[in-house]
Amino acid sequence: MLKPLLSLTGGLITTMALGIAQAAPLSQEDVSVAEVLRDRALESSDAYSIVESLTVEVGPRRTGTEGDERAVAWAQDKMKAFGFDRVYTEQIEVPRWIRGHAHAEVISPFPQPLVVSSLGYGAATPAGGLTAEIIEFPDVQALLKAPASQVKGKIAFINKRMERARTGEGYGPAAQGRKLGMRAAAEKGAAAMLLRSVGTDSDRFAHTGMMSVDDVENPVPALALSAPDANLLEAMLQRGKPVQVKLDVETERLSDGPSFNVIGEITGREQPEEVMIIGAHLDSWDEGTGALDDGAGVAIVMETARLIAELPQRPRRTLRVVLFGAEEIGLVGAKQYVEAHVKELDNIIAVSESDFGAGKVWRFDTRLPESKFDIADQMMQLLAPLGIERGNNESYGGPDSSVFVARGVPAFGLYQDGTDYFDYHHTPNDTLDKVDPENLRQNVAAWVVMSFLTTEMEGDLGRVPTASE
């Protein structure tokens, strides 16, 4: 393998003095090839052109829309052009929804407009809108504990700020309000729900996102407020006077329809039935162009596979790129994929997903049996020069990947710097100019090391405890 690779790269492969024993799961030859792939990614990876193409030629890709359909066709064309051995789609059934207009304004005591966005699959107001008094809650837990008599007929305002962190760990607590707030408001007889946007910015853009809407008997309108408008509403309430807000929202829930997971494979040369899945999600919300969420991830995993496909011979095992559909509305594509392939899960040796923007990878986590830590240790010797540190063994691999991990599939997690990711997440500001080409190359360099070495290793990675164990 080394001799053909020498001619492919046009340069000398430096043998790495890693001190790796012959009994290790990765041969010195495999490590050397991975080193070359890593360096090629840093020097000449063209992942940026992939995300540029997706955002310019397709744009927003909300599930069940024409943009979603265009994205599926775009992804198939790209994979075929990149020389993947097999490109195909698998249909999934998805709920569909139309976003219409959303207007909000303070009527009294200080009339002012508010910048809002309908939350995903939310309800409309009656024709002509509705006007009601605001009642504020510091978080969704406070709303859940409030007596219905306190909430009935009012607009419940959940005013939970998200904390900024490189790990994005503030997202989960803040997103609980978006997930559960409308349901809680509806059950207590509220007229509507307003939510401080789940984000870390101070821009006057609202952050949309999905809610828990299934089985809500009488859903009410639910809107995200931009951070400055949430601050404004908070300041008005602090003056001690009742605050009346008018909402005028148009949405429509449609019948379920089709979407697709798009799949491309580099077929293994020796053990093609054994598969590593690297994934991203193809859908996006509709108010930006989905450059960070998850156009960058799409570009990273597609470019990773393209670089491996250019090698003189195929990897030992199959590398499968899965661009999941309908992630934004509840991991629908991943869940339906796992159910459709449940008998094949034992052949999936590992899974990983890129779905956290385009910041530099700074940490490498795993979800492996302890007996398999040696493979991660060997990978780290190639990842460390990229500025990546070893993390923990609690990775879920990414949102879609978590569905596989729950069934016992091992996972790798290449975690990106998310310090500013939630400034743009689910907003009109999620656009191509937020993607740094140099950071994208560093991502691909890390991904190609992890992906190639996993497909080439001796032995397997075993299984991890399932969600029920």
Question: Where are the model-predicted features located?
Answer:
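Extracellular/luminal Protease-associated
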Residues: 65, 115-221, 289, 390
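Soluble metallo-hydrolase cores and metallopeptidase-like ectodomains found primarily
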Residues: 31-33, 108-148, 211-291, 303-316
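Metal-dependent peptidase/peptidase-like ectodomains
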Residues: 111-113, 132, 220-223, 230-231, ...
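Acidic/histidine-rich catalytic neighborhood of metal-dependent amide-processing enzymes
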Residues: 180, 201, 258-261, 284-375
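His/Asp/Glu-rich mid-to-C-terminal helical/loop segments that flank catalytic regions of hydrolases
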Residues: 306, 310, 422-469
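Bacterial N-terminal signal peptides
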Residues: 7-19
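Noncatalytic luminal/extracellular "stalk/propeptide" segments of secretory-pathway proteins
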Residues: 29, 33-36, 52, 56-155, ...
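N-terminal capping segment at the start of a domain
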Residues: 26-65, 205-210, 283, 354-359, ...
